Amino acid sequence: MDPVDPNIEPWNQPGSQPKTACNQCYCKRCCYHCQICFLKKGLGISNGRKKRRPRRTTPYNSENHQDPLRKQPLSQPRGEQTDPKESKKKVESKTKTDQFD
């Protein structure tokens, strides 16, 4: 093994770079050419632009958006339960009797 010179940066040490340049070949020998070739060719990892994937959305369900702990009771009307026509008749009869007072 070559002696390591502390005065030279690690990337400039002898044997730190391959003697041949990287190429576009994907054969086994070229895939193991250097660490960069192994990552790009062997593992298929590149730092290029990544494709944008659409988000997965769940189908809209109104039950998903409600509070499951509290179910509020239906509002109960207060007072007498009467038909609207009957209530109009009562109001008319009251107004007629009040007019004579």
From Swiss-Prot:
Residues 1-20, 45-101 are annotated as: Disordered. Asymmetrical arginine methylation by host PRMT6 seems to diminish the transactivation capacity of Tat and affects the interaction with host CCNT1. Residues 22-37 are annotated as: Cysteine-rich. There is a cross-link at K71 (Glycyl lysine isopeptide (Lys-Gly) (interchain with G-Cter in ubiquitin)). Residues 80-101 have a biased composition (Basic and acidic residues). Residues 49-86 are annotated as: Interaction with the host capping enzyme RNGTT. Residues 1-24 are annotated as: Interaction with human CREBBP. The modification Asymmetric dimethylarginine is found at R52, R53. GO terms for biological process: DNA-templated transcription; positive regulation of transcription elongation by RNA polymerase II; positive regulation of viral transcription; symbiont-mediated perturbation of host chromatin organization; symbiont-mediated suppression of host innate immune response; symbiont-mediated suppression of host translation initiation; symbiont-mediated suppression of host type I interferon-mediated signaling pathway. Its main location: host cell. Residues 38-48 are annotated as: Core. Zn(2+) 1 binds at C22, H33, C34, C37. Residues 1-48 are annotated as: Transactivation. Zn(2+) 2 binds at C25, C27, C30. One of its GO terms (molecular function) is actinin binding. The keyword Ubl conjugation applies. Pfam families: Tat (PF00539). GO terms for cellular component: extracellular region; host cell cytoplasm; host cell nucleolus. Interacts with host CCNT1. Associates with the P-TEFb complex composed at least of Tat, P-TEFb (CDK9 and CCNT1), TAR RNA, RNA Pol II. Recruits the HATs CREBBP, TAF1/TFIID, EP300, PCAF and GCN5L2. Interacts with host KAT5/Tip60; this interaction targets the latter to degradation. Interacts with the host deacetylase SIRT1. Interacts with host capping enzyme RNGTT; this interaction stimulates RNGTT. Binds to host KDR, and to the host integrins ITGAV/ITGB3 and ITGA5/ITGB1. Interacts with host KPNB1/importin beta-1 without previous binding to KPNA1/importin alpha-1. Interacts with EIF2AK2. Transcriptional activator that increases RNA Pol II processivity, thereby increasing the level of full-length viral transcripts. Recognizes a hairpin structure at the 5'-LTR of the nascent viral mRNAs referred to as the transactivation responsive RNA element (TAR) and recruits the cyclin T1-CDK9 complex (P-TEFb complex) that will in turn hyperphosphorylate the RNA polymerase II to allow efficient elongation. The CDK9 component of P-TEFb and other Tat-activated kinases hyperphosphorylate the C-terminus of RNA Pol II that becomes stabilized and much more processive. Extracellular circulating Tat can be endocytosed by surrounding uninfected cells via the binding to several surface receptors such as CD26, CXCR4, heparan sulfate proteoglycans (HSPG) or LDLR. Neurons are rarely infected, but they internalize Tat via their LDLR. Through its interaction with nuclear HATs, Tat is potentially able to control the acetylation-dependent cellular gene expression. Modulates the expression of many cellular genes involved in cell survival, proliferation or in coding for cytokines or cytokine receptors. Tat plays a role in T-cell and neurons apoptosis. The cell attachment site mediates the interaction with ITGAV/ITGB3 and ITGA5/ITGB1 integrins, leading to vascular cell migration and invasion. This interaction also provides endothelial cells with the adhesion signal they require to grow in response to mitogens. The Cys-rich region may bind 2 zinc ions. This region is involved in binding to KAT5. This is Protein Tat. The gene is tat.
